[in-house]
UniProtKB/Swiss-Prot annotation:
PANTHER family: ALPHA-GLUCOSIDASE, ALPHA_BETA-GLUCOSIDASE AGDC-RELATED. Glucosidase involved in the degradation of cellulosic biomass. Has both alpha- and beta-glucosidase activity. GO terms for cellular component: extracellular region. The active site is at D429, E432, D600. The gene is agdC. Its EC number is 3.2.1.20, 3.2.1.21. Residues 1-21 form the signal peptide. GO terms for molecular function: alpha-1,4-glucosidase activity; beta-glucosidase activity; carbohydrate binding; glucosidase activity; hydrolase activity, hydrolyzing O-glycosyl compounds. Belongs to the glycosyl hydrolase 31 family. InterPro entries: Gal_mutarotase_sf_dom, Glyco_hydro_31_C, Glyco_hydro_31_N_dom, Glyco_hydro_31_TIM, Glyco_hydro_b, Glycoside_hydrolase_SF. This is Alpha/beta-glucosidase agdC. It comes from the Eukaryota.
Length: 894
């Protein structure tokens, strides 16, 4: 019985599981259905073990509960959990469940999905009401629900088109033979293919062409292997192998890929809107030696006439890598503040990195954290320690009730606008959480000493070059101080928390905190974690949070919880401004708080190519549209050609940043003439399209409809596009077809059966569902085509403008690409670009028909902006100067 299970000791459970695990999984008895209660919008039932327990990877839980709810006509919620509700469930505080409208499935409306089940053994199926297509079917494979292992398998059509299940660096369309997607967030240097990376998104899209597209989301944060393969009978399947938690499924009816993404956003949350300036170009590097080198980069971009919106600083600014500190010799506060002021005076911005790990030594962030008791502790009450950049470290417990105040206070102190580093946005890293020390890491202090943590800072430069354009008080002062000796700070000995109780002794009584007695370090089932043991390179999974939850269950939530609290801390600093926070680690729903950069990639053509698929997965499936890769690659030495190509591609990432690693060749865009030219051209196009991007981005934050689109999202009935992940739509109007091979000046681009226009010439190209070879593509160019039927608003004066502030002052030109019927339409959204709450805006639709351009919509923002020109694409490109104010409805004849 489940109640009896809670009274057994860990040793007894382990011995029992191993003694009884004689049966293969295929012989597990499954469950039978009893006590079914039909409801207007679903049903409830009890599931009871249908035979002898098999106890293969834990102890079978005898009594389960089944609930189904037709939340809306397009969404079905199916939940299977233990009857006693002691098994861990993702807390509502971390993932708020959608509010279900009682009228969403009124009697006159018919749900688009159907739930059916078999009683003994229990299985269930989900089908599409309109065509009886079976979408999910567990028949023939018994449900296994054990203390540390949950298994559920669904059959699939042959050769299915599956997408999602991130984070990974595999093709967008998932492999379907002998393929395993492991979800266990880890520090994944070089983002190797076929492995678990920084995020966990148990959401997939199943695209079946004209039969429709649906989505399946499993709300479960435990480690898992999701296996896709064929069985011995050649039946295609997808199988969940989970280390715990419950089966909390949301099924989305679609029927289009865009519909599925919108429906997922209704559950996971709408993405956060970013400030307009955040869509500009960003520069960073790990390894800038001092604040003067950072300033020199700013100057060099200006000299090269490459627009730079935001300058970043990696952990180099810290005192021996300790968060919320400055290196007083290399990044003195007054000089950092002077640079920030210099940037702000020129409408540029500044960002630094913050890691979660706090140095276990005498420093303010550590001392204040101790006072509030916010750090993770072991079961004996002592502080849990790992080893990260500053050496021995402790980790904030995001579940602790004091942590929010602690984190907000640290930001308020260090990033104080009047006395600290007045950052404009935030970068958070290492929040899987990363830990350099392998389990069991019994002596993190010794590990840090042996592995040179923190690393020696660079020697203080005695004679940094003067900085043209900077004021005299900012210029370097000559110094012969070459003292870079390590400050070995005193390790503070902390007693166990007084009165601390081993969490896990009282986690019954339906509190959903996780079963007692589990093997939290070495569970019987081994997921394919590329780091090895669950606790390798991260926090130990047998430690507990202040609310009683085990790290074993919540590991995949750590980065997203840091994201949420960091966004709150940024809001506290600037309550009326939209925060921009970029994170490495994510879980489902993280897009409501943050954007994501795709991690520590490599300067290779393989990583360049796969960055497109990664970007599309996050933006179109996982609802994290502020996404992009490190342009030119993070680790390894880039090349001039690769960096040129990447500069042009990255300009069509929503998040556009150049970043690379200490010790590698410098790769700022001005380092090579050809790369500088590529960057200037690409940024000019990007900035001309910035309001088009901003409009599309805003729409996703309001409706959930994605704007960065795989081709199958735009042409769902074209079977030729299901595997294309080297082309994409930038908004629904612009097709981007980058060169993806080294040494090539051509690209084999697929054009669906539609009308397209070359962005550069305006000439038409009639797609016929075939591959067309585009030739003579220089290293500084990227092929772009506008889809027929679209109007694209572009800023008229973007060329040569250094900041997005300048861009916002220029007027508009409408690029009109008539469809096959001769008509076209497009949208434009303008607000103040930064306020959290907008009270005034221009939100309009442009239409073109029979030679007339019209505008209508919302005009509550007082503005002098106007449409100054139009360009009508076609065999004979037409350009006209017009005057169409954006202060009210109107139109002009061309």
């Amino acid at each position: 019985m489940a109640g009896t299970l809670l009274s057994w000791t860990p040793l007894a459970l382990a011995l029992m599981a191993r003694a009884l695990s004689q049966l293969p999984l295929t012989d597990c008895p499954g469950y039978r259905v009893i006590n079914v209660e039909e409801r207007p919008r679903g049903l409830t039932a009890d599931l009871t073990l249908a035979g002898t327990p098999c106890n293969v990877y834990g102890v079978d839980i005898e009594n389960l509960r089944l609930e189904t709810d037709y939340d809306t006509n397009q969404r079905l919620h199916v939940k299977i959990y233990d009857a006693d509700e002691n098994v861990y469930q993702v807390p509502d505080s971390v993932f708020p469940r959608p509010v279900v409208n009682d009228q969403a499935c009124a009697d006159e409306n018919t749900p688009e999905l159907r739930f059916s089940y078999a009683e003994d053994p229990f299985s269930f199926a989900v089908s599409r009401a309109s065509n009886d297509e079976t979408l999910f079917n567990t028949t023939g494979h018994n449900l296994i629900f054990q203390s540390q292992y949950v298994n559920l398998r669904t059959s699939l059509p042959q050769n299915p088109n599956l997408y999602g299940l991130g984070e990974h660096s595999d093709p967008l369309r998932l492999n379907t033979i002998n393929y395993t997607r492991t979800l266990w967030n880890r520090d994944a240097y070089t983002i190797p293919a076929g492995t678990n990376l920084y995020g966990a998104h148990p959401m997939y899209i199943d695209h079946r062409g004209e039969a429709g597209t649906h989505g399946v989301f499993l709300l479960n944060s435990n480690g898992m292997d999701i296996k896709i393969d064929k069985n011995s009978d050649n039946i295609q399947f997808l199988e969940y192998n989970i280390l715990g938690g419950v089966l909390d499924f949301y099924f989305f009816a679609g029927p289009s890929p865009k519909d599925v993404s919108v429906q997922y956003a209704e559950v996971a949350g709408l993405p956060a809107m970013v400030p307009y300036w955040g869509l500009g170009f960003h520069q960073c590097r790990y390894g800038y030696r001092d604040i003067f080198e950072v300033a020199a980069v700013v100057h060099n971009y200006s000299e090269a006439r490459i627009p730079l919106e935001t300058m970043w600083t990696d952990i180099d600014y810290m005192d021996h890598r300790k968060v919320f500190t400055l290196d007083r010799e290399r990044f003195p506060l007054d000089t950092v503040r002077a640079l920030v002021q210099y940037l702000h005076q020129r409408d540029q911005h500044y960002i630094v990195m913050v890691d979660p790990a706090v140095a276990h030594s005498e420093n303010g962030a550590f001392t204040r954290g101790l006072e509030k008791d916010v750090f993770m502790r072991k079961q004996d009450g002592t502080l849990y320690q790992g080893a990260v950049w500053p050496g021995a470290t402790v980790f904030p417990d995001w579940f602790h009730p004091n942590t929010s105040d602690y984190w907000i206070n640290e930001f308020a102190l260090f990033f104080n606008a009047e006395s600290g580093v007045d950052i404009d946005a935030l970068w958070i890293d290492m929040n899987e959480a990363a830990n350099f020390c392998d389990w069991p890491c019994t002596d993190p202090v010794a590990y840090a000493e042996e592995n040179n943590l923190p690393p020696e800072p660079p020697a203080v430069r005695p004679n940094p070059s003067s900085l043209p354009g900077f004021p005299a008080e900012f210029q370097p002062v000559n110094s012969n101080n070459n003292n870079s000796s390590r400050k070995r700070e005193t390790q503070v000995v902390i007693a166990a928390r007084q009165g601390f109780v081993k969490v896990g002794n009282d986690n019954g009584n339906g509190r959903r905190l996780g079963l007692q007695g589990r093997e939290l370090i070495d569970p019987p089932y081994k997921i394919a974690n590329a780091a090895g043991s669950l606790s390798n390179k991260t926090m130990n999974t047998d430690i507990f949070h202040a609310n009683g939850l085990a790290e074993y269950d919540t590991h995949n939530l750590y980065g997203t919880m840091m994201s949420s609290l960091s966004r709150d801390a940024m809001l506290y600093r600037r309550p009326e401004k939209r925060p921009l926070v970029i994170t490495r680690s994510t879980f489902a729903g993280a897009g409501s708080y943050v954007g994501h950069w795709l991690g520590d990639n490599a300067s290779t053509w393989t990583k360049y190519r796969i960055s497109i698929a990664q970007m599309l997965a996050f933006a179109s499936i996982f609802q994290i549209p502020m996404v992009g890769s490190d342009a030119c690659g993070f680790t390894g030495n880039t090349t001039e050609e690769l960096c040129s190509r990447w500069a042009t591609l990255a300009a069509f990432n929503p998040f556009f940043r150049n970043h690379n690693e200490y010790g590698m060749v410098s790769q700022e865009f001005y380092r090579w003439n050809s790369v500088a030219e590529a960057a200037r051209k690409a940024i000019s196009i990007r900035y001309s399209l910035l309001d088009y991007l901003y409009t599309e981005f805003h729409e996703q934050t309001v409706t959930g409809e994605p704007f960065l689109l795989p081709l199958f999202f735009v042409y769902p009935n074209d079977p030729n596009v299901v595997g294309i992940d080297s082309q994409f739509f930038y908004g629904d109007a612009i097709l981007v077809s980058p060169v993806i091979e080294e040494g090539k000046t051509e690209v084999h681009a697929y054009f669906p059966g539609d009308l397209f226009y070359d962005w550069y010439t305006g000439l038409p190209l009639r797609g016929n569902g075939e591959v067309i070879t585009l030739t003579d593509i220089g290293y500084t160019d990227i092929p772009l085509h506008v889809r027929g039927g679209k109007i694209v608003p572009v800023r008229t004066g973007s060329a040569g403008m250094n900041t997005t502030t300048e861009v916002r002052k220029s007027g508009f030109r409408l690029v009109i690409a008539p469809g096959l019927d001769g008509r076209a339409a497009g949208r434009l959204y303008i607000d103040d670009g930064e306020s959290l709450e907008q009270t005034a805006m221009v939100d309009v639709v442009f239409t073109y028909e029979d030679g007339r351009v019209s505008v209508d919509g919302v005009f509550t923002l007082q503005t002098d902006l106007r449409v100054e020109a139009v360009t009508v694409f076609g065999d004979n490109v037409v350009e006209r100067t017009i005057d169409l104010p954006l202060s009210g409805p109107g139109g002009v004849e061309l």
